[in-house]
C-alpha cells in the first residue's frame, strides 16, 4: 500500500503541475501580440490551440479524478486515520472526479463552438468559458488540499507512530 500511496501522491502532484503550466501558458497564448508579430495569432486561433491543450489535459484530469476516488474508497477500511480525515479525503476525491467530468463537458462545448468560428462566440460561450475557468480553479484547490491531507495520512502519520 505504501508504494501505491506514493504513486497516488505523484499523480496528484503531476496533475497540479500540469494545471499550473496551463495557467501560465493560457495568458501567453491569448496575449501573443506582446511576444510575436501583432496579428499573427487571432484570439480564435489562440483559443483553438489552447482547446487542444485542454483536451489532452482532460485525460489527465479524468484519470487523476477517478484514480483518487477509487484509491480513497478502497483505502477507507485499511486506514488508521481519523474518520474526519478519511471523510475529507473521500469528499475531496469525489469533488475532483465530478469537476473533471464537468471540465470535460465544458472543453467539448468550447471546442465545438470555436470550430463554428467567430459567429458562435456569444454571451453563452462567454458564460461557459468563465464557468470552465472557475471549475479548473476549484479543482486545483481541491487537488492541493487532497494532496496535503493524503500526505499527512500516508507520509507523516507513519513517521509519528514510529517515533513513539
What label would you give each PLM region?
Residues 20-33, 69-76, 100-107, 144-154:
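Transmembrane helix-loop junctions and nearby membrane-interface residues
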Residues 53-54, 122-140:
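Individual transmembrane alpha-helices with interfacial aromatic-anchor signatures
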Residues 71-93, 154-164:
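Cytoplasmic juxtamembrane regions at transmembrane-helix boundaries
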Residues 87-112:
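Hydrophobic alpha-helical transmembrane segments of integral membrane proteins
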Residues 111-119:
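Membrane-proximal helix-loop-helix units in multi-pass membrane proteins
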